[in-house]
Amino acid sequence: MTDDDLTHAIIGCAYKVHNTLGPGFLEKVYENALRIELEKAGFRVKQQEPINVVYDGQIVGEYYSDLWVNERVMVELKATLVLAKAHEAQLVNYLTATGINDGLLINFGPSVQVKRKFREYKPKIPLLNAILPTRSI
């Protein structure tokens, strides 16, 4: 399955969740429901995976990704009226910190909003091993 196919399937699952639950719930409700839907579709999903940003051998920041699908697509969820540039920047930062190339920003607002983002900066050090020491690659 290509990354395009994978992101398309994730988006389809998000629409199914939104069509079932409707708008108005907290982000965590949609996160849990989307994880269930993705797992039913046969995907490997990690939820609230820690992202440690390392500088000079020391952790200088820590984030948590909402969902990580098949260890290839980072999914950041929101439940707000509209998406803001800050939401997009958050996802791009997660992509940069992990070395993952592909991400989806999905908003479960009055209607589903989806933005696909790609890693913009390619660090000079191999980040996946340095930043996610708890993960096996």
Name each model feature, range by range.
Residues G22, V45, S65-L83, Y94:
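Conserved catalytic cores of phosphodiester-cleaving nucleases, focusing on short active-site segments
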Residues P23-Y30:
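Hot-dog-fold acyl-thioester-processing enzymes
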Residues M1-T20:
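Interdomain/boundary linker segments immediately adjacent to catalytic/signaling cores
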Residues A41-G57:
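A short acidic/basic microdomain associated with nuclease active sites
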Residues K78-I125, N129-L132:
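Nucleic-acid nuclease catalytic cores
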Residues M1-T2, D56, P123-I137:
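Intrinsic disorder/low-complexity segments
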